[in-house]
Each structure stands twice: as structure tokens, then as C-alpha cells.
Amino acid sequence: MEYDQLIQLHNIEDYFTKEMGLQIVDMREGYAKVKLAVEKRHMNCIGSVHGGCLFSIADSAAGVAASSYGSWATTVNGNISYLSPALQVKELIGEAKAVKHGKRISVFQTEIRDEEGNLLVRAEFTYYDLKKEIGSMSSD
């Protein structure tokens, strides 16, 4: 499956990220880039993007990067550092890059920046390769 097809599959079939408003905008082997137009529903009571939303962006970007190798993978572990609050931001950009790609276990580093390029989050995720070729599992 081509990367453009994988991007389209993620943007249409991933109901959680679709509900969030997260869009996959770039993907290649071991890499993914996602964007989120920040809306009121993403905010917490102090006017910052909710930490759970930021975690979901980071995990989703890493998950897309993990699937770039052609099979589905699932999160095993995630560690996140919130470096700066996401106050008064309009857009969030998450980029995930492979640190190590193994036969079953792979590690990805994700960074989230605002529209001005300020680093807000750095995270690391470990994924387990399910060895299920993309297209072989349905969402039914």
C-alpha cells in the first residue's frame, strides 16, 4: 500500500483521531506528521490544550509512523514530557520518528510544536508489531 493510501486510510478509518480532528499530513518509512486545529473542545479549564489531548496527538503520530512499515502495531508503553503549556495556540503539529525498528518492538520519538514552532511536548512510545498486514484487519 502506498503512503498516500495509508494516510487516507488513517484519516478515514481511525475514528478516535477523526473525532479529535487530527489529520495525518505526511508519512514515510519510520516517520509521520500530524496536525490539529485547536478548538474549544481540546481545552481544559485553565485555557490550555488538555494534557490528554497532547498525549493522544503524540501517541497517534507514533502509531502512524509504526504502521508505515506495512503492518499494524499497538502501543506497549508511552512516556511524555510536557515542556511548555499549550496556551493560546491555534494549531499543533506532531512529528514522530523511529528511534529503533525491530522485528516486533519499535521505539518512536514524538515532538509536538505550536504553529510558531515552539516545542511543547517530547514523548517516546514503544510499539508492538502485530504482524497483520495493513488491509488485513477491518474496523468491523
Model-based region annotation:
Residues 1-140:
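Terminal targeting signals and extreme-terminal segments of soluble enzymes
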